[in-house]
């Protein structure tokens, strides 16, 4: 199931936050005129356009990351997760030569390690791009061009692109030279 089929349709998005901050973040997003706000565990889902997501990235003091949902896929086991991620048109989201990283959160009875979920997800993305383009993207865990978020819950995974880059609490932070 594709989370956004037409450019004029509302996009499915979510902002992550520390647990117990969900009601506070939901109130903050409401104050930012963000449409369709729904608090969930460790995140607040919302709908809107890219401008809404960028506004949250710019003004939210409570969100850690903002993610554009691409798809919800079956994740009852590693093979189902791989197939679901392989079905996503990654060539539309990663430019030629772009680097990627995969952040995984959550587990289930079959997928018990977030590192394994991230590795299997990365394999599916890389294999899809290799089949479509004939070349594999490089992985850059620290500063990727595209950061993919995979959140497993029970037998499903929500797959998206992290729009915030570094965690939002690091805005304006400069490392000592």
Describe the role of every protein-language-model region.
Residues 2-146, 154-156, 163-172:
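Accessory substrate-recognition/RNA-binding modules or partner subunits associated with SAM-dependent
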Residues 174-177:
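Conserved SAM-binding loop and adjacent beta-strand
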């Amino acid at each position: 199931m594709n989370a956004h089929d037409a450019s004029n349709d509302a996009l499915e998005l979510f902002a992550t936050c520390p647990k117990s901050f969900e009601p506070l973040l939901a109130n903050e997003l409401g104050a930012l005129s963000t449409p369709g706000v729904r608090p969930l565990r460790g995140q607040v889902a919302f709908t809107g356009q890219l401008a809404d997501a960028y506004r949250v990235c710019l003004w939210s003091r409570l969100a850690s990351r903002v993610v554009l949902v691409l798809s919800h896929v079956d994740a009852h086991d590693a093979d189902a997760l791989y197939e679901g991620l392989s079905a996503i048109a990654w060539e539309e989201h990663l430019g030629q030569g772009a680097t990627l990283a995969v952040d995984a959160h959550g587990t289930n009875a079959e997928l018990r390690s977030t590192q394994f979920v991230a590795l299997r997800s990365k394999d599916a993305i890389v294999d899809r791009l290799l089949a479509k383009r004939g070349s594999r993207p490089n992985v850059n865990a620290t500063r990727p061009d595209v950061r993919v978020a995979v959140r497993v819950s029970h037998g499903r995974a929500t797959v998206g692109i992290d729009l915030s880059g570094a965690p939002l609490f690091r805005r304006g932070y400069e490392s000592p030279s």
